[in-house]
Amino acid sequence: MTDNARQIVLEHATEGAKLRERYFQQNADRVVELALQMALTLARGRKIMFCGNGGSAADAQHLAAEFVNRFMMERPPLPALALTTDSSILTAIGNDYGFEQVFQKQVQALGQPGDMLVGISTSGNSPNVVLALKAAREKGVTTVGMTGRGGGEMAALCDYLLDVSDRRTPLVQEIHITVGHLLCQLTDHFLFENVLALQPYLEGKAPE
């Protein structure tokens, strides 16, 4: 039994490492592109919102905390919030309108043109995240998806999509939080270490 348990550990680590290496070989440029857009969003005085369910809700809260507090360097707090944390709002909307609208209504209330919404879903099909992305598009909020399994319904709603094309939920989640950490680090890099990279875009050039 001990040998079997050890094998489970090693197989998970091996498969996770293979998927991680393949993912970042294919998507490194997309991660950098999104981090640049996050930095521009914040440099323009806008905010980043996050939403998801279950483990993805935990990721949403984790990443919002990294922006508001700090990541790896000392720097000013950055405006970010998770739409998963207020039990009164979540239960009021869920009770009166249904769980599908718990993020949508918050985006309608809080989202402003130029803000960003990051929806996290390992399936890409979470109804409440899908509706939140639709609401964001209606309000001129930049839409981002962190998904698995090809992106699902979210793919068509996202200005930026980081999809882990795999059906193993734990491995998808592990890459999501790694991507999130890289986005935090790179956003800090653009805002506080390489601000010259932002200047052309702040002066009117559209990101490529």
From Swiss-Prot:
GO terms for biological process: carbohydrate metabolic process; D-glycero-D-manno-heptose 7-phosphate biosynthetic process. Its main location: cytoplasm. The keyword Kinase does not apply. It is found in: Cytoplasm. It catalyses: 2 D-sedoheptulose 7-phosphate = D-glycero-alpha-D-manno-heptose 7-phosphate + D-glycero-beta-D-manno-heptose 7-phosphate. This is Phosphoheptose isomerase. It comes from Nitratidesulfovibrio vulgaris (strain DSM 19637 / Miyazaki F). Pfam families: SIS_2 (PF13580). InterPro entries: GmhA/DiaA, Phosphoheptose_Isoase, SIS_dom, SIS_dom_sf, SIS_GmhA/DiaA_subfam. Pathway: Carbohydrate biosynthesis; D-glycero-D-manno-heptose 7-phosphate biosynthesis; D-glycero-alpha-D-manno-heptose 7-phosphate and D-glycero-beta-D-manno-heptose 7-phosphate from sedoheptulose 7-phosphate: step 1/1. One of its GO terms (molecular function) is D-sedoheptulose 7-phosphate isomerase activity. The keyword Zinc applies.
